[in-house]
Amino acid sequence: MGSRRFSEPSRVGDYVNSLPPRASIITGSASGVDAAATKAARAKGIAVQVMPASFDELADAGKSAARNQRLVDACDVLVAFWDGSSTGTRATVERALDSGKEVHVFVGLPAS
């Protein structure tokens, strides 16, 4: 998961390519990190579970937070690619940490 404006999609692909074949990816199906992870996972034959946000969730911050909690609940390990400013990515990382999940965060610059 991660920021839509993460400037280094190749880092996402490199991470996915390092995963074992039995791994799976859960994604919110957004542009940016989600799209890069999905593309790399499908190219490698890694299972992808898509949990897209509904229109209501995109329009309502409270509903968006609930959807991000569902992503946290569904994962064993949260891997985030953060642009350093996205509040949604930061909040989801905090939710995962509060839930006792293993969390890995890769920080990059926002895309210009």
Language-model features and meaning:
Residues 2-111:
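Acidic/glycine-enriched connector segments
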